Amino acid sequence: DPTVINGGVINSIKNNAQLGKGEWAVIESDESDGSFLKLPITYSIVTNLDKEHLDFYGSFDSLKKSFFKFIEKTPSFGKALICADDNNLKSIIKNLKTKNFLTYGFAKNTNYQILNVRKKLNYSAFDLKLRLIRSQIYTIKNIKVNLIGEHNITNATGCIAIALNLGIEINKIKKALNKFTGIQRRFTKIFSLGKKDF
């Protein structure tokens, strides 16, 4: 039962925040003002790095350095999950000194590689190939999320990776994903007209 602070309204709780009774806090943060560097982290998901907020950072190089610092501060008992599909993040991965990170995405040779995506009208299904240790390569079949769009599959994969690192069983993870109905105003279906969804 974690405390949750999110940037958008979570459909299941009709709010963007919830005070939990557990030890964990799940926070959606961004790099807009540099305050994400002050967050105490154990696990993080780094989804993408774009040329944004340059009014604050002054240059893209300065922005990249802030992401580098954020990932480097991952403690030895935690992990940063980095999306290897993002070209700007790839350049950071190459220069990391820390070993406390794992990669995920559609890209080949990631630690958590998305495979066999099946896109349906109201949900997406996919398989996940895990490469954690050379002798430990296996595939989790038929993961379903009640969301559409490759970005939602990628985001779900980052969450799955953290849950697995925390020792949560895959069946429990799949059950939780089946219950998740998304965030308001993020690829939200508003209405249907004929065979088209808007």
Regions found by a protein language model. Give the residues of each.
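Short beta-strand-centered segment that lines the nucleotide-binding/catalytic pocket of NTP-utilizing
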Residues: D1-S12
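Short beta-strand segments
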Residues: I5-N6, E28, T47, C83
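Acidic, Mg2+-coordinating active-site environments of NTP-dependent enzymes
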Residues: S12-K14, Q18-K21, I41-F198
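Switch II (G3) loop of P-loop NTPases
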Residues: E23-D33, D197-F198
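Switch II of P-loop NTPase G domains
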Residues: S32-T42
